[in-house]
Swiss-Prot record:
It comes from Shigella boydii. The gene is wfeD. Pathway: Bacterial outer membrane biogenesis; LPS O-antigen biosynthesis. This is UDP-Gal:alpha-D-GlcNAc-diphosphoundecaprenol beta-1,4-galactosyltransferase. Pfam families: Glyco_tran_WecG (PF03808). Its EC number is 2.4.1.304.
């Protein structure tokens, strides 16, 4: 199911051509691909993009597709989504990261996008189910576009909880975007984006990314290739 969802997800500009588009938009990389594939609510997700050059190249090779990379950050679609919200006078709600990180991220986003209407924001931590429910009710009431950054699968779970209560919102997951944007308004250096080396900058800065890159990613490569040997063999013949 995950591969079909990826294949039928339109590029972001095409998706946003529909001013009334709603649903949950999420992203997969070598770390999260199998987490989402085995997620028991995957059928409730509406759009899945590939974030990560490694997975992108493997996926396109195995499936004979020409899918492009999409990620919710300033190397990819974040600017597009924020500008879309400004042009269409839509309110933005943000949920994720720690209190001080989301507050600083909001400041940096507002500085980078004059005119943006961030009408609600909250950390990704909830003291109780009652608080989580209250946050969901508030972000639904105050926002048109909602962006959740809690890591996989917590962010997908939150996005679907929001969707269950309201099917009138466009909901994106964004991974570590708020944490990154709290440190720099445009987290990735220009030359990093130019050469698609976002993974390298994250490896240098974050210990958990180094673990994923050197331990989890090799496991992913072996599993992905072994599970798709028949497709690879068929394509080569």
């Amino acid at each position: 199911m995950i591969d079909n969802l990826i294949k039928r997800t339109p590029e972001i500009n095409r998706l946003l051509e529909n001013k009334r588009v709603t649903g949950v938009v999420t992203f997969v990389n070598p770390y999260s691909y199998y987490k989402i594939k085995e997620y028991n609510k995957i059928s409730q997700l509406d759009y899945i993009y590939i974030d990560g050059i490694l997975l992108l190249k493997l996926f396109n090779f195995v499936n004979g597709t020409k899918i492009k990379r999409h990620s919710f950050d300033y190397s990819s679609i974040a600017k597009t989504v924020f500008n879309y919200s400004i042009q269409n006078k839509m309110k933005i709600g943000l949920i994720g990261s720690k209190d001080y990180e989301i507050e600083q991220a909001v400041k940096n986003i507002r500085k980078k996008h004059p005119g943006i209407d961030i009408s609600y924001f909250h950390s990704g931590y909830f003291s109780s189910l009652e608080e989580k429910s209250s946050v969901i009710d508030s972000v639904i009431k105050k926002s048109d576009i909602i962006i959740c950054g809690l890591g996989t699968p917590a962010q997908e779970e939150l996005a679907l909880d929001i969707k269950i209560k309201s099917n009138e919102h466009l909901i994106f997951t964004c991974g570590g975007f708020f944490t990154q944007t709290a440190s720099r308004a445009d987290f990735y250096y220009p030359w990093i984006k130019r050469y698609n080396l976002m993974w390298l900058q994250r490896i240098v800065l974050y210990k958990h990314v180094r673990k994923r890159f050197f331990i989890d990613y090799p496991k992913f490569i072996v599993r992905f290739i072994s599970e798709n040997l028949m497709k690879i063999f068929t394509r080569s013949n």
